[in-house]
Amino acid sequence: MSFLNQLKSQASALQSEKEAQNSRFDSNTQITESTAKSVALYVTDLAKQLNVIAPAGPKLTLDGKTPWPAMKMLDFRSDARKKTLRDREVYDYIGMGWSLLPVFGQPVGGSVSANFPPDLQRIEERLSAGGVKHERISVRHPEKNTLQAVRFDYTTQARGSLTITPDHDAGKLNFRLANVQGFGVVNLSYPVDRVQTALLDELAKMLIGQPSTFV
């Protein structure tokens, strides 16, 4: 076989592989988009129902020692955005956000301190995850001026969220849950054939603190 024929053979194999890959991508995109549409409708309806119910929120603490008051979930809002993928309009993400506020009365002020890096990092991550308004204050020795601790003065008001991002090429949905079972973020993925009403019901149960097999 001449060298040119070898190149032709190599090009033909690559072309066949590319066509098979494109066919697989198109199939995955179609299935994923259909699933994403169903999920968007579910999330929109879920937000409406939860706005009426205003379920109890998770137990919250920034340092693991200082509990927040009993919280409730309210002001649920759903959203969905689209993008263009291979000349086709598809879902970019599906989301729902909500407020976490005290069950009784208005948000109140609180304070936590840390003087070890791991504790400091944990508190900062939780403040960031919850979108908690706060002020960071360095506590120093009155005479030596050495740093003794870092204090965070905060208000007991936070945000929770659910973001679902379709991966059309891989045929899966990526779920990001923020502040659902306390401060923190959970990320996980499910293939689209697993994302049925039963799974979404388990997700809804998890969001409002009921026993769930979603994670």
Outline where the language-model segments fall.
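A composition-biased, non-transmembrane "mature-region" signal
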Residues: M1-V215
